[in-house]
C-alpha cells in the first residue's frame, strides 16, 4: 500500500511539473509573440519615418530647384524672344511672361519626365539638366511656381499709414463682383487689416468677433499669408477656393505685373477694359516692355488707368512642391522675394519670406492639387 502511495505521489508530482512546464512555455510564447509584434510595429514605424523623411527631402529639393529656375528665368540677359504667356491663373499653361521683364507667371514640372523643350530662340541652359533627377521613383511629383504680383495683393487695401485705401478697396470689390461674391467682404477684410478699431462696415471690428463662441480680435496688421482671411467674418472655405487664383498677401504696397495679371484683375483695375482682348494682344506680342506701352494701347484708349499701380516685372514668387512617394504625401510652399544685388557684377538673390507645410486637408485649396488631378485624367 505504501509503495502504491509513493508511486501515486511521483505521478502527481510529474503532472504538476508538466503543467508548470506548459505554463512556463505559454508565458514564454506570449512574451516572444509580444516582443515580435512590438518589434514589427517598431520596424513599420521606423520605415514610415524614413519614407516620410525621404518624401519631405524630395519636396525640399523641389523647392530649392524652383528657386534656381526663378533666378534663371528672370535673368535680364535671358533671351527676350523666348517670352510665353499665361491667360488666366487657372489656365495650367506651362510658362509665364517675358523673360526680359523678369516676369515668371507659372511653371509646372512633373517628376520623372523630361522638362519642357525650349521654344525656338530660347536658351536651353535655362534648364538644369534634361530631367528632374530626384523624383523618378515618386508616384507623383510636381513643382509649381507662381508670380504673386500677377494677383491682387490684399495688403494693398491699407496704406502705409494703416488707413484704408479707398481706390484699392473698389478694385477688390469689382473682383468680388466678377467672381459672384459679396462685395461687402472687401470691407470686412480691409477692417481686419487696418490699424484702427473703427468699423467701416456693420460688425466688422472687435466687438463682433468677441461675441463668437471662441472669442478673438481682428488682426489690425498686414496679412502674412493670404489664407489668414478665413478668420474674417463672411469668408468661408468656398470663398477661399474662389479667391485662390486671384489674391495674394505680399509685403505692400505692391504693383501688379501686367504681363502675368489675369483678365479679371486687369478689368477690375481698369474699368471698361476688355480683359480678354488685352490678354490676346499681350500674348501675341510677347508681353509689354513698359507700362507706357500698355497705357498707349488702343485697348486702354479713353479709359481711366493709374499707371503707378502697374509694372512689367515681379519680385515675389510662390513656389509649391508636392510629392507622393511609396504611399506617403508631403507638400510645402515658400514665398520668395527676388532682391537685386547692391554691388555691381553681382547676381540677384531669392530671399525666403516664409515656409510652411500644406496640411492634407488644405491641398484641395492649392493649384498644385488641381494640377496633379489634371495629370491623372
For each of these PLM feature ranges, what is it?
Residues 1-14:
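N-terminal leader/signal peptides at the extreme start of proteins
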Residues 16-377:
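Compositionally biased linear targeting/interaction segments
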Amino acid at each position: 500500500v505504501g509503495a502504491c502511495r509513493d508511486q501515486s505521489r511521483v505521478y502527481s508530482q510529474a503532472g504538476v511539473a508538466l503543467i508548470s512546464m506548459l505554463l512556463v512555455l505559454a508565458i514564454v510564447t506570449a512574451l516572444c509573440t509580444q516582443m515580435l509584434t512590438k518589434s514589427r510595429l517598431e520596424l513599420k514605424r521606423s520605415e514610415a519615418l524614413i519614407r516620410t523623411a525621404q518624401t519631405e527631402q524630395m519636396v525640399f529639393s523641389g523647392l530649392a530647384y524652383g528657386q534656381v529656375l526663378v533666378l534663371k528665368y528672370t535673368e535680364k540677359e535671358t533671351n527676350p524672344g523666348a517670352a510665353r504667356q499665361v491667360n488666366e491663373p487657372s489656365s495650367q499653361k506651362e510658362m509665364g511672361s517675358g523673360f526680359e521683364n523678369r516676369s515668371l507667371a507659372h511653371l509646372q514640372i512633373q517628376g520623372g519626365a523630361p522638362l519642357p523643350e525650349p521654344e525656338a530662340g530660347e536658351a536651353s541652359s535655362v534648364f538644369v539638366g534634361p530631367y528632374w533627377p530626384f523624383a523618378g521613383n515618386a508616384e507623383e511629383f510636381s513643382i509649381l511656381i507662381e508670380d504673386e504680383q500677377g494677383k491682387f495683393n490684399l495688403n494693398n487695401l491699407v496704406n502705409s499709414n494703416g488707413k484704408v485705401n479707398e481706390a484699392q478697396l473698389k478694385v477688390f470689390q469689382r473682383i468680388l463682383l466678377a467672381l459672384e461674391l459679396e462685395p461687402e467682404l472687401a470691407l470686412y477684410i480691409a477692417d481686419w487689416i487696418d490699424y484702427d478699431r473703427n468699423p467701416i462696415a456693420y460688425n466688422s471690428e472687435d466687438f463682433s468677433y468677441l461675441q463668437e463662441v471662441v472669442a478673438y480680435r481682428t488682426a489690425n496688421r498686414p496679412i502674412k499669408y493670404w489664407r489668414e482671411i478665413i478668420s474674417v467674418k463672411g469668408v468661408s472655405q468656398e470663398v477661399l477656393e474662389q479667391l485662390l487664383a486671384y489674391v495674394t498677401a505680399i509685403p505692400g504696397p505692391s504693383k501688379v505685373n501686367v504681363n502675368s495679371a489675369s483678365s479679371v484683375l486687369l478689368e477690375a483695375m481698369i474699368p471698361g477694359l476688355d480683359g480678354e482682348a488685352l490678354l490676346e494682344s499681350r500674348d501675341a506680342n510677347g508681353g509689354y516692355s513698359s507700362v507706357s506701352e500698355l497705357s498707349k494701347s488702343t485697348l486702354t484708349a479713353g479709359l481711366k488707368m493709374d499707371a503707378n499701380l502697374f509694372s512689367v516685372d515681379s519680385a515675389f514668387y510662390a513656389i509649391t512642391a508636392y510629392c507622393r512617394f511609396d504611399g506617403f504625401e508631403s507638400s510645402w510652399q515658400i514665398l520668395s522675394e527676388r532682391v537685386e544685388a547692391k554691388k555691381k557684377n553681382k547676381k540677384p538673390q531669392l530671399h525666403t519670406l516664409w515656409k510652411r507645410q500644406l496640411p492634407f486637408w488644405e491641398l484641395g485649396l492649392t493649384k498644385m492639387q488641381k494640377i496633379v488631378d489634371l495629370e491623372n485624367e
